[in-house]
Swiss-Prot record:
GO-annotated biological processes: microtubule-dependent intracellular transport of viral material towards nucleus; symbiont entry into host cell; viral penetration into host nucleus
Source organism of this protein record: Duck hepatitis B virus (isolate white Shanghai duck S31) (DHBV)
GO molecular function: DNA binding; RNA binding; structural molecule activity
Annotated Gene Ontology cellular component terms: host cell; host cell cytoplasm; T=4 icosahedral viral capsid
Region Disordered: start-end pairs: 183-262
The protein's assembly and partners: Homodimerizes, then multimerizes.
Region (RNA binding): 254-260
Bias-annotated ranges (Basic residues): 215-234, 252-262
Protein name, as recorded: Capsid protein
Family classification: Belongs to the avihepadnavirus core antigen family.
Xref: InterPro entries: Hepatitis_core (IPR002006), Viral_capsid_core_dom_sf_HBV (IPR036459)
Length: 262
């Protein structure tokens, strides 16, 4: 990957959360962008990675939504005097990446017991589900940003998306009173290129070529008694004839020829 594209991809993680579409909208848009490539069995890098994240997000999203629904249904059977487990006792996403998946439940259970040894069983299940759902949501957020990057590279081209992320980051980091009211859009960035390409084919005007070209001598014309003569043409040798005078006769023609009538 190009170094500028790699830097832009890293900057995607710093963009605001509300910049990206919701999960449902994102997956639908990504599938629309990927469908032509799926039909042609394309093995482009962006196609393969975006397809992977579409499948991953759909599975994780459904699982996470199920966790939230079960956790909410357990609230009715948790004793009302039960205090919720503080956030500090719940495993965070960064910690979960260092813990083997099979040991995740054991580590979370130990933390709940350290908070309150006789914590109610329904409240424990609720705490587990909330912790796992939070971990999944953070993983989904990273996957969502990566999916956005890859399917937009298919739509607009990697170079255009890289340029767009750079401009957007600059706009976001500029104080509000020194920047434009509206954030840059990728459509506005790519539009001049599309207009230039189309205009080159349909333009009927003349366009000055770039670079050096031989200078052309202007052709001046003059009008002599209704006839146009180009001054650039090679001029004939001067003659004693003046404009409007009869043609001069040769010396041999000074004597009149004998008249046919006598």
């Amino acid at each position: 990957m190009d170094i500028n594209a790699s830097r832009a991809l890293a900057n995607v993680y710093d963009l605001p959360d509300d910049f990206f579409p919701k999960i449902d909208d994102l997956v639908r848009d990504a599938k629309d962008a990927l469908e032509p490539y799926w039909k042609s069995d394309s093995i482009k890098k962006h196609v393969l990675i975006a397809t992977h994240f579409v499948d991953l997000i759909e599975d994780f999203w459904q699982t996470t939504q199920g966790m939230h629904e079960i956790a909410e249904s357990l609230r009715a059977v948790i004793p009302p005097t039960t205090a919720p487990v503080p956030t500090g006792y719940l495993i965070q996403h960064e910690e979960a990446e260092e813990i083997p998946l099979g040991d995740l439940f054991k580590h979370q259970e130990e933390r709940i017991v350290s908070f309150q040894p006789d914590y109610p069983i329904t409240a424990r299940i609720h705490a587990h589900l909330k912790a796992y759902a939070k971990i999944n949501e953070e993983s989904l957020d990273r996957a969502r940003r990566l999916l956005w990057w890859h399917y937009n590279c298919l739509l607009w081209g990697e170079a255009n998306v890289t340029n767009y992320i750079s401009r957007l980051r600059t706009w976001l980091s500029t104080p509000e009173k020194y920047r434009g009211r509206d954030a840059p859009t990728i459509e506005a960035i790519t539009r001049p290129i599309q207009v230039a390409q189309g205009g080159r084919k349909t333009s009927s005007g003349t366009r000055k070529p770039r670079g050096l070209e031989p200078r052309r001598r202007k052709v001046k014309t003059t009008f002599v008694y209704g006839r146009r003569r180009s001054k650039s043409r090679e001029r004939r040798a001067p003659s004693p004839q003046r404009a409007g005078s009869p043609l001069p006769r040769s010396s041999s023609s000074h004597h009149r020829s004998p008249s046919p009538r006598k």
